[in-house]
């Protein structure tokens, strides 16, 4: 076996190891993110309007070639922006109040970004 083939073999093996590491980290962190979102999401309103919101967080894994695309979403997607950022309460076209923001996505998003990077760095050492 010549030097070029040996180097290519070593690089291929390394690349496959990195790909597996990244996929494993993405899967583990996304599962933990779902747990955190379910724990920190608003549970119910006074009128029971979104009582299942906290339980509706899901992970979709969509592989694209060797890279995974992890999507974390809520089935009640219409509520995510309203709950995260707050919104006006309108009755019959008149603003009657304001619902305060309940930030629960942004803290988990920040954690996911730092945790993925940290775990990949640790795995490569």
Residues covered by each model-derived region:
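Short, Lys/Arg-rich flexible segments
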Residues: 1-73, 77-80, 85-125
